[in-house]
A protein has these predicted regions:
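C-terminal/domain-terminus segments
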Residues: 46-65, 222, 226-228, 232-234
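Acidic/polar loop-and-plug regions of large Gram-negative outer-membrane beta-barrel proteins
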Residues: 1-28, 53-106, 170-184
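Active-site loops and adjacent core secondary-structure elements that bind or stabilize anionic groups
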Residues: 41
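Hydrophobic, lipid-facing positions within transmembrane beta-strands of outer-membrane proteins
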Residues: 21-27, 113-119, 199-205, 250-254
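Extracellular loop and loop/strand-boundary signature of outer-membrane beta-barrel proteins
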Residues: 10-15, 24-28, 102-107, 120, ...
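Signature of Gram-negative outer-membrane beta-barrel scaffolds
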Residues: 130-265
């Protein structure tokens, strides 16, 4: 483990750590309408909560120093004689820096809420003809941000490498040149902070015909998928919500199968 090491207090440290929890809840209902038709419905929800460590720095060079290896080559900048990663050296560098921490650790949060409904109606129209049709509806919200969790002995951190890309016409705070160098503390957001929204609505149907050794079907579906984003990092509240974009999709399929005998078709 090229990132294994200790800080100046002898505490074990690491720059790679991931955790994720994603429970799923579903409610299913089966309705036998009559002897030839039925309705199957599932309502479900997925709750995802997780994060992983993400080393940040004032410059891209600083950020790369968090990597124990780079393309298979050992990073020796912060390396002790015994081979462990020298987290204490990062603390010393940050404490001595007059411009706050050069390297800090953030937690990359990636959460989601996913809701969905799937309902399928089946009807045995005749001995040889069966109809299946239904709806599929989903709504997905994902939350992504990077939160400072450790300044590594620096007094603050300035995320100027990211904030320099924020335009005043999109975020009024960027009109103040000092905002780019704001002195951030543990709990503040760096690099990104946004929510993504996705909704999908679809209908589908299939008609299947069976007669002795011959089976044929035709099916089709139509769906709409919409996207939009709410960005709190690069935009202020007046501009945070992006354009809503929708895409219509469809499928048409057909096929047939003939059973020559019990083993071949």
């Amino acid at each position: 483990n090229a990132e294994y090491g200790f800080d100046k207090n002898g505490r074990q440290r690491y720059s790679h750590f991931n955790e994720y929890h994603k429970p799923q809840i579903s409610l299913n209902h089966q309705w036998q309408i009559d002897y030839k038709s039925s309705l199957s419905t599932a309502l479900y929800m997925s709750i995802g909560r997780g994060s992983g460590y993400s080393g940040q720095g004032r410059t891209s060079a600083d950020r790369n120093m968090w990597k124990g290896t780079n393309y298979g080559v050992l990073n020796t900048t912060f390396r002790n004689p015994d081979g462990t990663f020298a987290y204490d050296k990062i603390q010393e560098m940050n404490a001595a820096s007059p411009d706050g921490s050069r390297m800090i650790m953030s937690k990359s949060n990636n959460n989601h809420m996913w809701y969905g409904l799937l309902s399928t109606y089946t009807n045995q129209i005749s001995k040889s003809l069966e109809l299946s049709a239904g709806i599929d509806v989903r709504y997905y919200i994902d939350e992504h941000n990077n939160e400072i969790i450790d300044l590594y002995d620096g007094k603050y951190f300035s995320d100027d490498s990211s904030r320099a890309n924020v335009k005043p016409e999109q975020n009024a705070a960027a009109a103040d040149p000092n905002w780019v160098y704001e002195k951030l503390q543990v709990g503040d957001k760096v690099y990104r902070d946004y929510d993504g929204h996705v909704h999908q609505e679809g209908v589908f149907a299939q008609l299947e015909w069976t007669k002795k050794n011959l089976n044929a079907f035709v099916s089709g579906s139509v769906s709409n998928t919409g996207y939009w984003r709410y960005d709190r990092f690069y935009y202020d509240a007046a501009h945070a919500e992006s354009e809503h974009v929708n895409f219509i999709g469809y499928t048409v399929k057909g096929g047939a199968n003939y059973n020559i005998n019990e083993k071949h078709n």
